[in-house]
């Protein structure tokens, strides 16, 4: 049996060959399925409608201020916010990754999605009220207000942008490229460039409001399209009972070859395929990791991740924010039916390809020697759906990819502009900040395209495990800092900084080791030292989280506390304080505001036609009237208001109980 040190380069080379080799004749012919008037018409209509919604949002919304561009002026209602939360989370990586892992191991992977409902409630009821009362636009900005200093803010901003590139953008582009290559037969980089260019147009011109409105449309398309595919898949397989029976017998016809002795467990469906909670030691997703590890990574993703939180910060009021979280919570219970089970059905219908285990056979089927599970969902779309509906499902994949990327681009530009650019250009005017945010999106596009070759050679196995593993190595220390920052006022800057540093080092040790040695497979176990890679990544997330908390609390209690006068409305115990807060970053903010006022006082120069057109597209055409001091105070009060009307507070609280009951039944049935 080859060691992983030699197996990894082989896997990397074969994965890279996807973009250069023709693959099997069957895959090459799949693109012919889309070459018909019905499918092409549906795709064209999709792009026209999405562009129309983007232009409508661009004209309708205020994009000429930082608050309008990045937070939609706190004017969004619950239903587009809820749809945007869902669409921002569900990228093409979910369709490819969840379906692929479902095909390989069963329904346990759905726990990564379904447990999110609880953290969405934590977000709406506990975290967002603090963020709004603090008056922040970004998560690093909250750390600066809470702890003072600049190193935490800069550290978290840089780390968040790094995570955007290696995790979110890379996974979405890789999975989207798989589908687009099969469906359209386009060159990989040409397809990616076109998609990223269209995505960037919405983000650069429209701001957050445009992103949310297009996300709402994308969410509707995703839900309708994936529901139709689910119906077709279950009809084809003969219903649910037939599905459960046939899946357990979906064994590939070729299980020997390449001079390998292949264990039956590598190609036989697992006995616990239809259970979410699995053995604590031998399970691929152990139940303690599901119960305790997943909530930690979900805490980082749903309550601290800029992409998600930014959508909640733009709500009209707290009732709208909570209602949006509830809507998204309901929608997060659907992936098991819309993505995971269709992936399992794909294994039944196309067993020799989706469940291939012999490396040479996998190369013959899909051009990759480490497995073809990532092709489970695209195969269903291209071979099962009739004309017209294939175009609809391609639109679904485009929608999931573009909605996720628009969200990432907008939030990443917010992080760069508000947390990093203002450190470089302290005297930047509001106009300059808006332009800088839009230009940074262009930089992200270039970075994303350059990252594609790295993604190709890194994704030999199941995509969803890659994304969750990276989240488990980088997310827990951030989750620990924000959790104790909000719920323990004794924590100070020194504790938070060293907790993040220790957690980052431990996380990078595991992540770099896995990149170096590989994660292994059923055929070739990893040669990574057991002391580093011997525990499941979800268990490692638990260890990271509690080590970070111990360091944060230990250092904080050994150093001076932050006086309460700096913490009013920044932590839970002081959330309702009426006293005036003296921000730890007050001097920096006053200096920046004075510099901004100096530039804004300059007279506006006459503009030509080209300049006016450019300003119209970028939301810079209207010079907002200067607010009086009273108007500034009123605006600040609106942006930091967390009050609710009693009736609507009761309505959302009742809906929480209903959601919890539905989720309890869901887990009780599938556990």
From Swiss-Prot:
Record topology, Extracellular segments: 60-65, 111-116, 181, 240-288, 346-378, 456-467, 516-537
MF terms (GO), sorted A to Z: D-glucose:sodium symporter activity; low-affinity D-glucose:sodium symporter activity; proton transmembrane transporter activity
Protein name stated in the entry: Solute carrier family 5 member 4
PANTHER family hit by this protein: GLUCOSE SENSOR PROTEIN SLC5A4-RELATED, SOLUTE CARRIER FAMILY 5
UniProt biased composition (Acidic residues): 583-593
UniProt feature, compositional bias: Basic and acidic residues: 594-604
Record-linked Pfam families: SSF
Organism the protein comes from: Rattus norvegicus
Membrane topology annotation: Multi-pass membrane protein
Keyword Ligase in annotation: no
Family, similarity comment: Belongs to the sodium:solute symporter (SSF) (TC 2.A.21) family.
Main location: membrane
Keyword tags: Cell membrane, Membrane, Transmembrane, Transmembrane helix
GO biological process terms, semicolon-separated: D-glucose transmembrane transport; proton transmembrane transport; sodium ion transport
Cited Gene3D superfamilies: Sodium/glucose cotransporter
């Amino acid at each position: 049996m080859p060691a992983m040190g030699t197996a990894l380069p082989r896997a990397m080379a074969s994965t890279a060959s996807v973009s250069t080799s023709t693959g099997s004749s069957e895959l090459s012919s799949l693109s012919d399925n889309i070459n018909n008037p019905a499918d092409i018409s549906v795709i064209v209509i999709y792009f026209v409608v999405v562009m129309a919604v983007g232009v409508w949002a661009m004209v309708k919304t205020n994009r000429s201020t930082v608050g309008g561009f990045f937070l939609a002026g706190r004017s969004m209602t619950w239903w587009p916010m809820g749809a945007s939360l869902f669409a921002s989370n569900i990228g093409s990586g979910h369709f490819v990754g969840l379906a692929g892992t479902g095909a390989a191991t069963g329904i346990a992977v759905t726990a990564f999605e379904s447990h999110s409902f609880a953290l969405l409630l934590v977000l709406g009821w506990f975290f967002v009220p603090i963020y709004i009362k603090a008056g922040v636009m970004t998560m690093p900005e909250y750390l600066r207000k809470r702890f003072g200093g600049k190193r935490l803010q800069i550290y978290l901003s840089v780390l968040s942008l790094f995570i955007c590139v290696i995790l979110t953008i890379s996974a979405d582009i890789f999975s989207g490229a798989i589908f687009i290559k099969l469906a359209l037969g386009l060159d990989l980089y040409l397809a990616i460039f076109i998609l990223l260019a269209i995505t960037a147009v919405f983000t650069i011109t429209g701001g957050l409001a445009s992103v949310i409105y297009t996300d709402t449309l994308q969410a509707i398309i995703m839900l309708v399209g994936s529901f139709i595919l689910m119906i077709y898949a279950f009809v084809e397989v003969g219903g649910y009972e037939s599905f459960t029976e046939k899946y357990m017998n979906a064994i590939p016809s070729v299980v020997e070859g390449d001079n390998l002795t292949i264990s039956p467990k590598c190609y036989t469906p697992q006995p616990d395929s239809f259970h979410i909670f699995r053995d604590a030691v031998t399970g691929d997703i152990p139940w303690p990791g599901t119960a305790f590890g997943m909530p930690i990574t979900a805490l980082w993703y749903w309550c601290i991740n800029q992409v998600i939180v930014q959508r909640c910060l733009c709500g009209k009021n707290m009732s709208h924010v909570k209602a949006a979280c509830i809507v998204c919570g309901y929608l997060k219970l659907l992936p098991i039916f819309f993505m995971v089970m269709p992936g399992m059905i794909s294994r039944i219908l196309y067993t020799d390809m989706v469940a291939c285990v012999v490396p040479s056979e996998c190369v013959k089927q899909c051009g990759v020697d480490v497995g073809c599970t990532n092709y489970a969902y695209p195969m269903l779309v291209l071979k099962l759906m009739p004309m017209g509906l294939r175009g609809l499902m391609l639109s679904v994949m485009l929608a999931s990819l573009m909605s996720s990327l628009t969200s990432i681009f907008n939030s990443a530009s917010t992080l760069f502009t508000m947390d990093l650019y203002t450190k470089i250009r302290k005297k930047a005017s509001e106009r300059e900040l808006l332009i800088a945010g839009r230009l940074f999106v262009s930089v992200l596009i270039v970075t994303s395209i350059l990252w594609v070759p790295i993604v190709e050679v890194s994704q030999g196995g199941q995509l969803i495990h890659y994304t969750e593993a990276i989240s488990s190595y980088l997310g827990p220390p951030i989750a620990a800092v924000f959790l104790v920052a909000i719920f323990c006022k004794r924590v100070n800057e020194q504790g938070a900084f060293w907790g993040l540093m220790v957690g980052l080092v431990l996380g990078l040790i595991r992540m770099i080791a896995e990149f170096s040695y590989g994660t292994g497979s059923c055929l070739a176990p990893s040669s990574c030292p057991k002391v580093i890679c011997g525990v499941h990544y979800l268990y490692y997330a638990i260890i990271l989280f509690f080590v970070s908390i111990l360091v944060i609390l230990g250092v904080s209690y050994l150093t001076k506390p932050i006086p309460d006068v700096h913490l009013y409305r920044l932590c839970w115990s002081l959330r309702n304080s009426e006293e005036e807060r003296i921000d730890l970053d007050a001097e920096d903010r006053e200096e920046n505001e004075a510099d901004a006022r100096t530039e804004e006082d300059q007279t506006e120069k006459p503009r030509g036609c080209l300049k006016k057109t450019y300003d119209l597209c970028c939301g810079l055409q209207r010079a907002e009237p200067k607010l009086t001091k009273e108007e500034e105070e009123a605006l600040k009060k609106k942006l930091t208001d967390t009050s609710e009307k009693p009736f609507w507070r009761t309505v959302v609280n009742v809906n929480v109980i209903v959601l919890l009951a539905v989720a309890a039944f869901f887990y009780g049935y599938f556990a």
